[in-house]
Amino acid sequence: MAAPRVFPLSCAVQQYAWGKMGSNSEVARLLASSDPLAQIAEDKPYAELWMGTHPRGDAKILDNRISQKTLSQWIAENQDSLGSKVKDTFNGNLPFLFKVLSVETPLSIQAHPNKELAEKLHLQAPQHYPDANHKPEMAIALTPFQGLCGFRPVEEIVTFLKKVPEFQFLIGDEAATHLKQTMSHDSQAVASSLQSCFSHLMKSEKKVVVEQLNLLVKRISQQAAAGNNMEDIFGELLLQLHQQYPGDIGCFAIYFLNLLTLKPGEAMFLEANVPHAYLKGDCVECMACSDNTVRAGLTPKFIDVPTLCEMLSYTPSSSKDRLFLPTRSREDPYLSIYDPPVPDFTIMKTEVPGSVTGYKVLALDSASILLMVQGTVIASTPTTQTPIPLQRGGVLFIGANESVSLKLTEPKDLLIFRACCLL
């Protein structure tokens, strides 16, 4: 009998402090519905579900016919399951890490280096940069999902410099004036001026940052108490960030970066060197397998200011331009494909109405990981003897060139996300 190449996984949960608590967390809810024995602690955060082979959260195989305990062990001994191109391109490794995130309090403002810089940083400071890989990532909202992403249009930043004197004070008059003057210039002049402004902010003395932030918080609080709307300078968000990270330089970053609220199904793609921060909500995320992060604020952790200011992409764009749009499949009316301009990963979203009784997950020349977000099915493949029941929160590994038939066991809509590598 052929060894199974499609099998369910038990995946690692990360309980970082910023995660949503207990059953408020989509991560915890997915876990509870896929595993009847799972005990959800209501006083603990459930931040991330990791689906992949990362050493800090290698998925366990739930198939007693398979001798290997973890997905990375199995892939190491079944290399053809990756797909020939994936195996050759990524040295026999699964190139992506697939996740669900449930965010209650903001994550740090950060950017990820490109491959060239990652190699250099890893050599120079392996304690801060643990590998030599780049880390592009994509987030697709499951619930309304708020984040900061990329530099705003310069006109918006200039407006904040006028309306927020504390922000202008930290940037300095010279850099602020220069930014206003370059608004109509070419993109290189704008980028250079923007870099100068951002660097001035990031290199401000801690004491001065705390003073200016306290002035701003006091001003917003007084105006809000008097019944004035302060949303033109994101008053509510600033107070919230300051409460969570008092005196943190990152509180001022909201005046530099686009604020996005993604509706379910909307996505943002974060290429190398783009500053970003997740603020609140639940999402599916996929990324290249790396842990390299250069932080910029909203964090008690190490901030590498010189590297950050040097590496960032200072290309302004509007918030609507930061949305990453999927393409609808021509062959499959239920399938949307989020295919970013990097080779490491692609996400497929499948929405099947409950009135349909069966659905076929097509074979790909790539290993893939499938997550059931909604629905209940029985999965079978031409090579498996035993059908696999899957419900909300269920995770399935699908070897390259394997198709899977799903039989809906309830008349409820299906929502499925599948991470793969389309080379």
UniProtKB/Swiss-Prot annotation:
Residues annotated as binding Zn(2+): 110, 112, 137, 276
Bound how, and how many: what does the cofactor note say?
A: Binds 1 zinc ion per subunit.
Q: Which InterPro entries match?
A: Man6P_Isoase-1 (IPR001250), Mannose-6-P_Isomerase (IPR016305), Pmannose_isomerase-type1_CS (IPR018050), PMI_typeI_C (IPR046456), PMI_typeI_cat (IPR046457), PMI_typeI_hel (IPR046458), RmlC-like_jellyroll (IPR014710), RmlC_Cupin_sf (IPR011051)
Give the cofactors, semicolon-separated: Zn(2+)
Pathway(s) per entry: Nucleotide-sugar biosynthesis; GDP-alpha-D-mannose biosynthesis; alpha-D-mannose 1-phosphate from D-fructose 6-phosphate: step 1/2
Which residues does this entry mark as bearing N-acetylalanine?
2
**Which EC numbers does the record give?**
5.3.1.8
Molecular functions per Gene Ontology: mannose-6-phosphate isomerase activity; zinc ion binding
Q: What is its main location?
A: cytoplasm
Instruction: Please list the residues that carry the modification Phosphoserine.
Output: 102, 108
Stated role: Isomerase that catalyzes the interconversion of fructose-6-P and mannose-6-P and has a critical role in the supply of D-mannose derivatives required for many eukaryotic glycosylation reactions.
Q: Known NCBIfam families for this protein?
A: manA
Family recorded in the similarity comment: Belongs to the mannose-6-phosphate isomerase type 1 family.
Query: What is the official name of this protein in its record?
Result: Mannose-6-phosphate isomerase
Instruction: Give the species.
Output: Pan troglodytes
